[in-house]
Swiss-Prot record:
HAMAP family cross-referenced by the UniProt entry: YidC_type2 (MF_01811)
Protein name: Membrane protein insertase YidC 1
Biological processes per GO annotation: protein insertion into membrane; protein transport
Species annotation: Streptococcus pyogenes serotype M1
Keyword annotations: Cell membrane, Chaperone, Lipoprotein, Membrane, Palmitate, Protein transport, Signal, Transmembrane, Transmembrane helix, Transport
Broad class of the protein's primary localization: membrane
InterPro entries referenced in this protein's UniProt entry, alphabetically: YidC/ALB3/OXA1/COX18, YidC/Oxa/ALB_C, YidC/YidC1/YidC2_Firmicutes, YidC_ALB_C
Pfam families xref list: 60KD_IMP
Coiled-coil regions listed: none
PANTHER family, sorted: CYTOCHROME C OXIDASE ASSEMBLY PROTEIN COX18, MITOCHONDRIAL (PTHR12428:SF65), OXA1 (PTHR12428)
Signal peptide: 1-25
Topological relation to the membrane, as annotated: Multi-pass membrane protein
NCBIfam families hit by this protein: yidC_oxa1_cterm (TIGR03592)
Transmembrane residue ranges: 58-78, 129-149, 171-191, 198-216, 222-240
Length: 275
């Protein structure tokens, strides 16, 4: 019973924390050095860092460099999240089998399901909540960076290449690039999954469309951040968690298992003939 309650408690925490972060991040007023709240001070700190990285006064360059710096710092957490998610996907068939086996709603059955599930997690070295921690750490950082671009006045000015950072891109090239890299990052993330999640498959196409249409009206500085962040994620996936290599390795292991079983059958047939 304690394990069931602990699982429920962790699920509630996982749901509440993002909501709290969202409420904190909903401020729309301008952020200055005199802003009093701790959250606004973090936003302003990010803005000053971007300004410091803006070589020759180019805020666009500052946005790119700061985004890359943040993504590099968060890379170990991202890698942990991806690996944990992959492990959870690998054991989903066995988890579903347990859920079918212990389908009852009574307390004793639920306790048994929790115990068997914990044993399965231990067997494969999986922590079902490990993928949540990196996400919860990344969320406030990414939200603060987003708000630095929208709530601090000195980041709303300047140009980068063909765009005014405070205005939307009249050529719509940045929204297109942001949508393309968003599609690639979500597609690559889902590509190596053993079992395709319907919601994730839908998001592969919905997220890029949302980014594309939102990019029509948002300041180009924000869309530039989205573009660089998702482009970095694509490169990171290909280097550290290449789905094509994962699929190839999975296929190799499947072929080896198939060959092993074939050899065993042949050996049994030979043994029977000798008798």
């Amino acid at each position: 019973m304690r394990k069931v309650l602990r699982v429920k408690k962790n699920i509630k925490i996982a749901r509440i924390v993002p909501l709290v972060l969202l409420l904190v991040a909903c401020g729309r007023g301008e952020v200055t050095a005199q802003s009093s709240s701790g959250w606004d001070q973090l936003v302003y700190l990010f803005a000053r860092a971007i300004q410091w990285l803006s070589f020759d006064g180019s805020i666009g360059v500052g946005i790119i460099l700061f985004t890359l710096t943040i993504r590099l710092m968060l890379m170990p957490l991202f890698n942990m999240q991806i690996k944990s998610s992959q492990k959870m996907q690998d054991i989903q068939p066995e988890l579903r089998e347990l859920q079918r086996k212990y389908a009852g709603k009574d307390t004793q059955t639920r306790m048994k399901l929790a115990e068997e599930s914990q044993a399965l997690y231990k067997k494969y070295g999986v922590n079902p909540y490990a993928s949540l921690l990196p996400l919860l750490i990344q969320m406030p950082v990414m939200i603060a960076l987003f708000q630095a671009l929208t709530r601090v006045s000195f980041l709303k000015t300047g140009t980068f290449l063909w765009v005014e950072l405070a205005q939307h891109d009249h050529l719509y090239l940045l929204p297109v690039l942001a949508a393309v890299f968003t599609f690639l990052s979500t597609w690559l993330t889902n590509l190596a999954a053993k079992e395709k999640n319907v919601m994730m498959t839908v998001m592969i196409y919905v997220m890029p469309l949302m980014i594309f249409f939102m990019g029509f009206n948002l300041a180009s500085g924000v869309v530039l951040y989205w573009t660089v962040s998702n482009a970095f994620q694509v490169v990171q996936l290909l280097l550290l968690n290449n789905p094509f290599k994962i699929i190839a390795e999975r296929q190799r292991l499947a072929n080896e298992e198939k060959e092993r079983r074939l050899r065993e059958r042949r050996a049994r047939k030979k043994a029977m003939k000798r008798k």
